[in-house]
Amino acid sequence: LRVSEVCLGTMTFGESWGWGSSKEESKRVFETFVSAGGNFFDTANFYTNGESERMLGEFVRSNRHDFVIGTKYTLTANPDDPNAGGNQRKNLFRSVDESLERLGTDYIDVYWVHVWDYMTPAEEVMRGLDDLVRMGKVHYLGISDAPAWYIAKANTLAEFRGWTAFAGLQMQYSLTERTIEREILPYARSHGLLTTAWSPLSGGMLTGKYGTGAERRTAPGSRLDNGGLRDHFLTDRNFEIADVVKSIADETGRPMGQVALAWMRHVDPGIVPIVGARQPAQLDESLASADLELSDEQLGRLDAVSRIDLGFPGAMFARAEAAIYGKTLERIDTDLEGY
């Protein structure tokens, strides 16, 4: 399956959550992305109470086979019904049929488990997803927001049973959130899974939307005008990272968001950022990051301010090399898969 270097996130399609875009503005964002060569779209049954799927389905209808549509299931559609959310088979089959109806299509290119529910057995999840593939309702499978051990367990089980395995991961990844570098990203690389990154601009933090330096601000009416999201994104550490991004943006004469996306492309060109926009100009700005090359010194500053502690056991491996290999490491071919 061939996808564009950037995925268009459509969580902003629709105004039912109070901060999205109208149908007309969403259509312009869609057309801007397609005109730039984009073919990969991300949505979910949960986004804007179904508006996102309905709009996207309408926009792609005349050329459906030209586009790669990914949607997700798991988050509840009815907080009073214990079966209206979760990874289990009942919610899976209900959700996929409702998404197909809203999208106005008879197949979904990539169907994502939105978040691990920590209850449903992996065998039930993978068997149910494989059934959807065999029925032709879904072509490829992915999982979002799950621990590496569970993804490995689920895929090993699927391969052993002859079922369809997860082909891609969707994880939060940005300069302010690098913890997938501990286990999830190495697993994806070693097993050939595509990684898509949600919130690559940290909810707008890395665009300067919420200020830098001493001039910090919240944004009433934005999606971070919410206690949980605000506390997650608007932290002292994240503002420190944004300050460094701002200094490099000033040096390059480019917007902050382009610096953040250029850093991600340098870390791993195979990571596909999911970029959202309420207006075409915002999307154009993000897409223009493709030709920005940062210097080694600038990349070093970004790494230094955002680096995470790998913890155990990751942090000990470099220290253990001499104890394992003695003086022979330089004579060993380490260009091996998984090294």
Segments and roles (model prediction):
Residues 1-17, 70-83, 107, 112:
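N-terminal small/glycine-rich loop or linker at the start of catalytic domains
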Residues 180-221, 255:
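Aromatic-lined glycan-binding groove of carbohydrate-active enzymes
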Residues 214-251, 266-270, 284-339:
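Terminal-tail/helix-coil boundary detector
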Residues 1-6, 37-40, 64-67, 105-109, ...:
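Short, well-ordered coil/turn segments that N-cap beta-strands
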Residues 8, 26, 41, 56, ...:
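Conserved, mostly hydrophobic/aromatic
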Residues 79-183, 190:
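Glycine/proline-rich, positively charged
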Residues 1-67, 134, 339:
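N-terminal binding-site loop/beta-alpha segment at the start of enzyme catalytic domains
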Residues 11-13, 44-46, 72-76, 113-116, ...:
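Active-site beta-loop-alpha junctions enriched in small/polar residues
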